[in-house]
């Protein structure tokens, strides 16, 4: 019998893994927020610093311009056609980032595959310079491997 996957644990592991990847790349501390986004009260009025901490999936260093949304989903997405799942993730990332005046940065861990990074196209000034590997455009978002983005 196939073992049931605990989605909460899988998401927590992905967030920890992503925090380690970003910490290593930037040499600055990144950490899990520790409260699932579903449990974060959107209606509660938080002060600016608390809102900065609890809005994203990761606590980012001071001055980091991105709001990091982390997903761990075992589904591939066809970037040539509309994807309700990807649209849902992008809306959440964009809404959260807008609420704290940051740039949305979606990182998607695929089961037994690498990480995918998704950023708004308007913030990618020169795709030829930034992305040395394969990238794609989905609506107004640039999609590439996280490894390619972080170099």
Predicted regions and their residues:
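Catalytic phosphate/metal-binding cores of nucleic-acid and nucleotide-processing enzymes, i.e., regions
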Residues: 1-151
């Amino acid at each position: 019998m196939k073992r049931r996957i605990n989605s909460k644990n899988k998401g927590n592991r992905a967030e920890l893994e992503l925090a380690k990847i970003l910490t290593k790349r930037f040499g600055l501390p990144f950490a899990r927020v520790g409260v699932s986004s579903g449990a974060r009260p959107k209606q509660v009025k938080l002060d600016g610093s608390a809102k900065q901490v609890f809005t994203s999936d990761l606590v980012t260093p001071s001055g980091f311009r991105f709001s990091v949304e982390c997903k761990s989903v075992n589904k591939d997405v066809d970037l040539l056609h509309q994807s309700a799942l990807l649209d849902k993730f992008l809306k959440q990332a964009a809404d959260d980032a807008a609420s704290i005046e940051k740039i949305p940065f979606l990182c998607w861990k695929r089961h037994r595959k690498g990480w995918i990074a998704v950023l708004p196209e308007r913030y990618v000034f020169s795709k030829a310079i930034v992305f040395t590997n394969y990238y794609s455009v989905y609506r107004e978002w640039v999609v590439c491997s996280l490894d390619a983005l972080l170099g």
